[in-house]
């Protein structure tokens, strides 16, 4: 193993080749941030569904009617989440087209 590889002589610490252009690095960073935001959004969705639907609908002792409540709450929450996400994505895309981002 060469010392240059230990000290990052042939590659950067992020694992990208040293010959990467700044635009390649920028694209990779944008992609990574986008993926991390998607994971954070999915986590937030699961947390909110649990908080809002399960706590609202599930009571002890269990009753079959609770399944219907959870199903309806989840469907309503997902419709709302999708509508908000679409509006947000459209707004971001429009800002990108206009050069605001």
Curated annotation (Swiss-Prot):
Q: Which residues form the signal peptide?
A: none
Q: Name one GO biological process term.
A: protein transport
Question: Does the record carry Metal-binding as a key word?
Answer: yes
Q: Which top-level group of life is the source organism from?
A: Eukaryota
Q: Name one Pfam family in it.
A: zf-Tim10_DDP
Task performed by this protein? Mitochondrial intermembrane chaperone that participates in the import and insertion of some multi-pass transmembrane proteins into the mitochondrial inner membrane. Also required for the transfer of beta-barrel precursors from the TOM complex to the sorting and assembly machinery (SAM complex) of the outer membrane. Acts as a chaperone-like protein that protects the hydrophobic precursors from aggregation and guide them through the mitochondrial intermembrane space.
**UniProt-recorded name of the protein:** Mitochondrial import inner membrane translocase subunit TIM13
The scientific name of the source species is Kluyveromyces lactis (strain ATCC 8585 / CBS 2359 / DSM 70799 / NBRC 1267 / NRRL Y-1140 / WM37) (Yeast)
* Lineage of source species: Eukaryota, Fungi, Dikarya, Ascomycota, Saccharomycotina
């Amino acid at each position: 193993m060469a010392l240059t590889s230990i000290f990052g002589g042939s590659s950067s610490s992020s694992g990208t080749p040293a010959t990467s252009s700044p635009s390649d690095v920028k694209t990779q960073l944008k992609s990574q941030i986008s993926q991390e935001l998607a994971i954070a959004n999915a986590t937030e969705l699961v947390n909110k569904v649990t908080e809002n639907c399960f706590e609202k609908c599930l009571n002890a002792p269990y009753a079959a009617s609770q399944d219907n409540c959870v199903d309806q709450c989840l469907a309503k929450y997902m419709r709302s989440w999708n509508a908000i996400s679409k509006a947000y994505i459209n707004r971001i895309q429009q800002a990108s087209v206009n050069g605001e981002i």
